[in-house]
Amino acid sequence: MELPESAWEQCVSSLQSELPAQQFNTWIRPLRVQQAEASNQLHLIAPNRFVLDWVNDKFKSRIDELLSSADHHPITSVEISVAPRRSTSFETNQGVAARQKRQQEAPRQNIASSQPSNSYSRQPQQPAVEMPAESQMAQVELLPAAPPAPLNNGYNTESFAQPYNDNPMGQGKVDKVDVEGGLQHKSNLNPTFIFDNFVVGKSNQLGLAAATQVAENPGGSYNPLFIYGGVGLGKTHLMHAVGNALCVRKPGAKVVYLHSERFVADMVKALQLNAINDFKRYYRSVDALLIDDIQFFAGKERSQEEFFHTFNALLEGGQQIILTCDRYPKEINGLEERLKSRFGWGLTVAIEPPELETRVAILKRKAEQVGAPLPNDAAFFIAQRIRSNVRELEGALKRVIANAHFTGRDISVELVREALKDLLALQDRLVSIDNIQRVVAEYYKIKVSDLHSKRRSRSVARPRQVAMYLAKDLTHHSLPEIGEAFGGRDHTTVLHACRKIKEMIESDADIREDVKNLLRTLTT
């Protein structure tokens, strides 16, 4: 029946314009329409109980309002329920049985135990290559290698236990867990990434809540957990925190963390050495599989095929999957639709760039960890200038602390200015009033000259106010200087514009999204 679906599409369109992108993508976008018995009824399916409860609590009344006033075919009855799921336990009897069945059915290769190695063979160093077909195996160049221990079939199966390492200094722990067949699972979790030292703010509180729930109830409703957001925002920290918590909760748990490119490299080598069954048995026998930067699967059809079956096997066995990505799953070009669909079966949460207060809290926490007193004014100064992500924030703090250490001075705003002068000078060149005006004009599809003009139509006045707000927020120019740059306006006009936009950011989702997008463009 098309009428309820048409009304829902109209409702979704309205909600998308009303809500911030993070809220819309997390709560509204995953909802699906189920066939209704009557034209005035609508049955929506939520992917899990968490989404169901949140939508009912926060958005149900607005959904009812929009659907009841839909054009031509109002909906008077709206029901939301949870999609039926298969296995939902971390270690259910069904999950264990399914895993044992897969292991028994997979033909065994000769597997020899060896000392852990970061490589597969003694071949020359080359990047990992996607394997399009078995007929091309001979052409594949392999990962760099150290001399491995002798293997019966030339295949170092322990290399599966050497995933992408985000901790090259060796601080991460590598936990081995023997499994049937001689393989060893190594978690490669960074022990410093735990929930206790994750700084929470508005930008990441949903991600933290979801990760905490997964750690307490792995393999449950939030499976898979898909965390997306820009670089350096804490996605990997949360992923490691869940893994570390699972290992504490269940000592000996087979928790494997790796980068998506490592999964590809393992599969390529397995294909070349005719050991694909070892590969399948290894990745499908874990308790939790944590894969970073899933967007690198894009365009790799053979890897996507194998991961698709691995994904299904793990969910069937009640084993937890956590994935991170730099964008919403539906926006990953080159990724099969069936994978995108499955990524939405659990819970999808976004991590946004931290707001000012969270950036200050992060700086204070990091400084405290290394025993460096950081005054509030210095912390706020750094946080106001470094906006894009936590990694850049930490990098700036390290420069400040090093400068204080080598000069024997206490940290102050003056010292921060000196330590970061190159970075601040670069920012001043990049974030100028002229640049702000150009970016805002392009964003709103108007001319820069319109921002200077006396025109007061809404299509020009609002972008002008946004540009003034950004100029005050991102530059050191005074209000009179900003007013002069916008057609010789009075400083009170600039002050009014800044106050107006600040209020609208709190109340208007469109303006809030516009300012967020413009800030991202101007500061990254």
From Swiss-Prot:
Binding-site list for ATP: G232, G234, K235, T236
One Pfam family of this chain: Bac_DnaA
Chain positions covered by the region annotation Domain I, interacts with DnaA modulators: 1-73
Chain intervals for the UniProt region annotation (Disordered): 86-173
Notes on the domains: Domain I is involved in oligomerization and binding regulators, domain II is flexibile and of varying length in different bacteria, domain III forms the AAA+ region, while domain IV binds dsDNA.
Protein name according to UniProt: Chromosomal replication initiator protein DnaA
PANTHER family in the record: CHROMOSOMAL REPLICATION INITIATOR PROTEIN DNAA (PTHR30050:SF2)
A GO cellular component entry from the record: plasma membrane
Entry's Gene Ontology molecular function annotations: ATP binding; ATP hydrolysis activity; DNA replication origin binding; lipid binding
CDD domains: AAA, Bac_DnaA_C
Annotated segments matching region Domain II: 73-187
